[in-house]
Amino acid sequence: MGKPTGFIEIKRREPDAQPPAERIRFYREFEIPLAESEVSRQGARCMDCGIPFCQSGCPVNNIIPDWNDLVYRNRWREASAVLHSTNNFPEFTGRICPAP
């Protein structure tokens, strides 16, 4: 699952956001997505917890550890299939997810 020491070695990174002065001019996405390489690095932070509370606590039962591992390994199509196996609308539910 991910990189065994990834949680320690790789600092958590959130997407940047456009400044408010820019985003008030339009109704588009204001988060600036991370590059694919950075998303993959973030996937390496997933630990083999034994009891993945991220998954058991997920209201839509996403298989988060498997998904993160596939992202870490750049297996994007498989990661998408795993995510869509439990969640038809990840782009919506991801915005209201209670986890940071």
Segment roles from a protein language model:
Residues 1-100:
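Ferredoxin-type iron-sulfur electron-transfer modules and their immediate structural context
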